[in-house]
Amino acid sequence: MALRYPMAVGLNKGHKVTKNVSKPRHSRRRGRLTKHTKFVRDMIREVCGFAPYERRAMELLKVSKDKRALKFIKKRVGTHIRAKRKREELSNVLAAMRKAAAKKD
């Protein structure tokens, strides 16, 4: 514990020390997006487009049925967290499409 106040008792007692900061373990990087992975996924998305369930979810998001879209995606992808991430991704795509359309006009 670092000595914050010159006191002999209490939570702040003891010698002044520097915290030994260890770098994060390599096992913690699992699932982190790399530049290469991002490039490959973007390329595949450009070539293949969206899956039918993603297109339907986007239609639901267009008409502001966010909760219905979440339930629909959850049924397709399995877990609540994955469904939330997918819904967020699709809403970002829709926002980008809207922005591109506005810029075009």
Curated annotation (Swiss-Prot):
The modification N6-acetyllysine is found at K62. It is found in: Cytoplasm, Cytosol; Cytoplasm. InterPro entries: Ribosomal_eL36, Ribosomal_eL36_sf. GO terms for biological process: cytoplasmic translation; translation. Keywords: Acetylation, Cytoplasm, Ribonucleoprotein, Ribosomal protein. The keyword Cytoplasm applies. Transmembrane segments: none annotated. Pfam families: Ribosomal_L36e. GO terms for molecular function: RNA binding; structural constituent of ribosome. GO terms for cellular component: cytoplasm; cytosol; cytosolic large ribosomal subunit; cytosolic ribosome; membrane; nucleolus; synapse. Component of the large ribosomal subunit. Component of the large ribosomal subunit. The ribosome is a large ribonucleoprotein complex responsible for the synthesis of proteins in the cell. Belongs to the eukaryotic ribosomal protein eL36 family. This is Large ribosomal subunit protein eL36. It comes from Homo sapiens.
